[in-house]
A protein has these predicted regions:
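Catalytic Walker B motif of ABC-type/P-loop ATPase nucleotide-binding domains
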Residues: 150-154
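Helix N-cap at the start of a conserved alpha-helix in ABC-type nucleotide-binding domains
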Residues: 161-163
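Conserved ABC ATPase "signature" region
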Residues: 96, 100, 106-121
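Helix-to-loop junction immediately C-terminal to a conserved catalytic motif
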Residues: 48
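Conserved ABC transporter NBD signature motif
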Residues: 56-67, 71-72
Length: 249
């Protein structure tokens, strides 16, 4: 389970998170959607323990991310939007290194590569991987430790539709096994049949919850659904006229 209360985060003078409060439950896939700069990726990084919030609280698998930082991090697996690996190591070598850090039997590494469709690339150096293969290696990392909480930031952007569908089905399977899964995405319509909940993030807060069974194709449709009816068919033009402002309909 994931829970946050009034999380804030500033970078210099710019505030990115203005009070994020959310809950994601076990056995569910929770989406976080919203425009660029809404705070989705920052929230994921806070939960993964990569950056520290300025205020607020967050718990991952029951552990406070500040007071029980190590326990919280061991409870999570994180897939960044653009996974990066040591360029001179092979896929199998980097996975074995990660397995050692997480206390996972190295015998699982080759099985994870096979699962992610990278069995034939096990001894390929990561610098030679395509964007899609790099993303799949990230998925192998995500699943290797069998962590109870999975955090995914824009998964599948580098994957073709077939592999994106495979990833969604795999995450559905992991949720049914009891995992808590939080996903940020711009490909919102593709998750209609997969997600259990969908949170709309905008301006550093969770604005509202959307129906995951009826997600639109893009954010313009979300925006139009939230406008007041009297303004949807009115085109306003603000012009300066003799020092006065007038609105022309």
């Amino acid at each position: 389970m994931i829970s946050t209360e009034n999380l804030t985060k500033r970078f210099g003078r710019k505030t990115i998170l203005h009070g994020i409060s959310l809950r994601a439950d076990a056995k569910q896939i929770t989406l976080m959607v919203g425009p660029n700069g809404a705070g989705k990726s920052t929230t994921i990084k806070v939960l993964a323990g990569l950056i520290r919030p300025n205020s607020g609280t967050a718990h991952v698998n029951g552990f406070d991310i500040i007071k029980r930082r190590i326990a919280a991090q061991r409870s999570t697996a994180y897939l960044p939007q653009r996974p990066s690996f040591h360029p001179k190591l092979t896929c199998l070598e980097v996975l074995r290194f990660y397995a050692g850090l997480r206390g996972v039997p190295v015998s699982r590494c080759e099985a994870m590569l096979q699962l992610a469709g990278l069995g034939d690339a096990a001894r390929m150096h990561t610098e030679k991987l395509s964007g899609g293969m790099r993303q799949l290696l990230g998925v192998a990392f995500l699943l290797l430790a069998d962590a109870p909480v999975l955090l995914l930031d824009e998964p599948g952007l580098s994957l073709d539709p077939g592999w994106r569908k495979w990833l969604q089905q795999k995450l559905r399977f992991e949720a049914e096994r009891g995992k808590t899964i939080l996903v940020t995405t711009h490909l919102i319509a593709e998750w209609n049949d997969v997600a259990d909940r969908c949170l709309l993030c905008r301006h550093g807060v969770i604005e509202r919850e959307l129906d995951p069974r009826n997600l639109p194709d893009d954010f313009d449709e979300i925006d139009s659904s939230t406008k007041r009816p009297e303004f949807t068919s009115i085109e306003k033009e603000l012009t300066r006229n003799g020092g006065l402002f007038s609105i022309t309909r």
